[in-house]
């Protein structure tokens, strides 16, 4: 399973201080709302930061690099962060992410790990808001065995540190991944999985909200509670959790709500597997693996409804198309569902 990096944590003190000192740009946005379009705003922001750099504003260097990063101009971002790494710990953090993930450069996991360790081992007060996120990323490296020797034990230790007992100001991503980790490891520890998904969900994590719905639905790590399950799943689905959407499709099918199943599943099944999965992952911060799994589930059940004419006019040619799509998206899940179909359990 491929995990994703923790996004750069915000430093509310430095950013708010910067905003308080530099009112020109923010006033410009208010005075010219018709000009507030993305391309224009980016260009103006770059000009603004260039002027701040000319006047000796040290923070403007990092903000320019971060703007490059957020726009996907990774080579420019990398060059900017390399230039200021000796003076800016946030640049060191971003270099760790970029080298590990191969953004703007050839992937070098060992170098990425080195940057993250530098953050975690630093005693500088300016690194405090970065430590939990760096620990999550190091845990990811140990879990994936990239840049370091693979170790689930070390990954777990680092994630527990990063999760900080459910602290909302720590790494909420680590809290969510611990929920996933305890539900996957052998032997499973579903009570711990439920605990960590609960903590992450309470701190706003969308992936864990869907996972909680699934655990309530099947009584995993907690007493079965269909009402609580549907509450979590529907809210997660509305917020864009595609796996939660897939679970709801399955629930509607099993409850014989075929019209609802068809209308809900078609929209999900028609997502573009090449372009939509990365986009949804970026927007929701959900793992691509579970996004594709939700799409596969929706595609399979939509195909079944088309095949049998449940809630929709029978169309076997279209059914074959969606069965094939489910197999492409997640062969293992499609095989499991096909086995249930053969045994007439679907």
Swiss-Prot record:
Cellular compartment(s): Cytoplasm
InterPro entries in the cross-refs: LRP2-binding, Sel1-like, TPR-like_helical_dom_sf, TPR_rpt
Q: Repeats (Sel1-like): which ranges?
A: 92-124, 132-167, 172-205, 206-241, 242-276, 296-331
Q: Where are the TPR repeats?
A: 58-91
Q: Name one GO cellular component term.
A: cytoplasm
State where it is primarily located. Answer: cytoplasm
Q: Which UniProt keywords apply?
A: Cytoplasm, Repeat, TPR repeat
Q: Does the keyword Cytoplasm apply?
A: yes
The record describes its quaternary structure and partners as:
Interacts with LRP2.
What is the stated purpose of this protein? May act as an adapter that regulates LRP2 function.
Show the PANTHER family listed in the entry.
Answer: LRP2-BINDING PROTEIN
Q: What is this protein called?
A: LRP2-binding protein
Query: What is the scientific name of the source organism?
Result: Rattus norvegicus
Gene assigned in the entry:
Lrp2bp
